[in-house]
From Swiss-Prot:
Specifically methylates the pseudouridine at position 1915 (m3Psi1915) in 23S rRNA. This is Ribosomal RNA large subunit methyltransferase H. The lineage of its organism: Bacteria, Pseudomonadati, Campylobacterota, Epsilonproteobacteria, Campylobacterales. Disulfide bonds: none annotated. S-adenosyl-L-methionine binds at residues 73, 100, 119-124. It is an enzyme of class 2 (transferase). It comes from Aliarcobacter butzleri (strain RM4018).
Length: 151
């Protein structure tokens, strides 16, 4: 199984990255998990113009990556518990998670995804969302493989 996490974010090295890398390492027994931070010139320019332009730039950046089973993280997405989250990624060859930028996603992009979920009703920094997401991926893989971490 391959799991990709795509985030509209400038790459930085910080304590969050250490935690994310640790969850990726622990997950490697069950799946190949990779995080891809994307912040290109098109996105940077669009974010100085406004919301619609930014959402369009996010869509244009992400749409070529839509393959396998695609899950968008969106504030208006379905709230799921850990078991439902685990079911979303169970028995999939490739899963792609898409984290939007500051302005969220266009409705058209969300409609192209297989699932749209929310990690929480709380607003989180992108790095915090990545920590939560990588932990939930590891927890889900443990559930699927009867590993005691979840208990």
């Amino acid at each position: 199984m391959k799991i990709n996490i795509y985030a509209i974010l400038k790459p930085t090295a910080d304590n969050f990255d250490q935690i994310i890398k640790e969850f990726i390492k622990m997950s490697s027994k069950y799946a190949k998990v990779e995080v891809h931070y994307i912040f290109n010139k098109n996105i940077a320019k669009a974010q100085t113009i406004g919301e619609k332009e930014s959402q369009l730039a996010y869509s244009q950046t992400y749409e070529p990556l839509l393959k396998g089973y695609n899950i968008a993280l969106d504030v208006l997405g379905k709230r799921v518990d850990t078991y439902a989250f685990s079911s979303l990624i169970d028995n999939k060859n490739e899963v792609n998670f898409f984290i939007g930028g500051a302005y969220g996603f266009q409705r058209e992009f969300l409609n192209k995804c297989d699932s749209v979920i929310s990690l929480s009703d709380l607003t989180m920094a992108h790095k915090v969302a990545n920590v939560v997401l990588t932990e939930q991926i590891f927890r889900s893989l443990c559930i699927q493989n009867n590993h005691p971490y979840h208990k």
